[in-house]
C-alpha cells in the first residue's frame, strides 16, 4: 500500500524530476526547444506556461509566458519578435521556437508548466554555433629559389575550435594536391605552414580551409617562385637605365654650360683693351684757312703739351745757332699724335737745323706753318 502511494506521488509531481536536453544550432537558422505536458484543461483558466533563459554569465530572464489566456512574447529587447510557441500549447505542446538564432540566444532554457497545483519542468541547453569568417591568406618570406616561405591563414571570428587545412589546387592534369614534401605545420598556430628550400616546382595555387561544427570557409593564394639570376638581371637592368639617364643629363648640362660660356665670351670680346695695340700714327695736315688753323692749333696744343714744349725748345735752338735770312718766312712743324707719357723729347742735330734753314727758301712766303690736328 505504501509503495503504491509513493508511485502516485511521483507521477503526480513528475515535473519535479524534469528532463534535460542539449541542442546545437548554427546562427541565423531556426531552432525549436521541446516542452510537452498533459496538464491542459481548456475549460479552466488555471494553466500557466513560462520559458526562462539563464545565459552563460548566470543572468536569468523571462522569454515568453502564457497566463490568463494571453501570450506575452515581447518581454526582452534582445529576443523581441523572434520567439513564439511552436504548436498548440493548450493541447500539451509548449515547445519554444526561435528564429533567426543569434549568438546571444545561447544558454540554459527552462520550461515551466503549472495547472491546478501540478507542475512540469523541462530543461534545454542551447548552443549557438557561428561559422568561421572568410579567412585571409598571406605570404611571409621571399619568393626566390632556396628561400623559406610561410603560408598564413586566419579567421577573425567563429566558434572555437577552428581547424585550418592547407592544400594545393590542381591546375594541370597530374599535379599533386598535397603540400610539398619539405613543408612543416606550426602546431602552435595551425594556420601557418612553412615551405622550406623553395624550388620552381613549389609554384602554384594554395588553398586554406577554416572549419568548425557550423561550417567552413576558404581562401586561395598564388605562389610564384623566381630564379635568383632573373632577379639579378632585373636589378642590373634598372641600375643601367638609371645610370644612362644620369649620364645623358650630365652631357646635356655640359653642352648648355659650354654654349653659355661661348656666348659670354663673344659679348665681352669687343670691350677688351689690348695692351700691345699700336698707338694712332701722327699725320701732318695743311690747314685751308686761318680759322681752321687756329682751331687745329688750339686742339693740338691742349692735347699734346709735351710735344709743344719739345717744338719750342727746337725753335730756340734754331734762333741761337742760325739767324733767319731777311725776307724769308720760317716754318714751324708740330707733331700730330697722342700724348705719350714718360717719353723723352727727341734731340735736334745740327745737320737737321741746317736743312731746316735752307728749306724755307723753296716755299712761298705766303704759306703758313702746318699745325697739328
From Swiss-Prot:
The gene is CLMP. Predominantly expressed in epithelial cells within different tissues and in the white adipose tissue. Expressed at high levels in small intestine and placenta, at intermediate levels in the heart, skeletal muscle, colon, spleen, kidney and lung and at low levels in the liver and peripheral blood leukocytes. Highly abundant in the intestine during embryo and fetal development (at protein level). Residues 264-281 have a biased composition (Basic and acidic residues). GO terms for biological process: digestive tract development; postsynaptic modulation of chemical synaptic transmission. It is linked to Congenital short bowel syndrome: A disease characterized by a shortened small intestine, intestinal malrotation, and malabsorption. The mean length of the small intestine in CSBS patients is approximately 50 cm, compared with a normal length at birth of 190-280 cm. Patients with CSBS may develop severe malnutrition as a result of the hugely reduced absorptive surface of the small intestine. Infants require parenteral nutrition for survival. It comes from the Eukaryota. CDD domains: Ig (cd00096), IgV_CAR_like (cd20960). The lineage of its organism: Eukaryota, Metazoa, Chordata, Craniata, Vertebrata. The chain crosses the membrane at residues 236-256. It comes from Homo sapiens. Induction: Up-regulated in mature adipocytes and adipocyte tissue of obese individuals. Residues 264-373 are annotated as: Disordered. It is a single-pass type I membrane protein. Residues 355-373 have a biased composition (Polar residues). May be involved in the cell-cell adhesion. May play a role in adipocyte differentiation and development of obesity. Is required for normal small intestine development. InterPro entries: CLMP, Ig-like_dom, Ig-like_dom_sf, Ig-like_fold, Ig_sub, Ig_sub2, Ig_V-set. Residues 19-235 are extracellular. This is CXADR-like membrane protein. Residues 257-373 are cytoplasmic. Disulfide bonds join 35-111, 153-208. Glycans are attached at residues 74, 197. Keywords: Cell junction, Cell membrane, Disease variant, Disulfide bond, Glycoprotein, Immunoglobulin domain, Membrane, Repeat, Signal, Tight junction, Transmembrane, Transmembrane helix. GO terms for cellular component: bicellular tight junction; cell surface; cytoplasmic microtubule; postsynaptic membrane. It holds the Pfam family V-set. Residues 19-127, 135-224 form the Ig-like C2-type domain. Its main location: other.
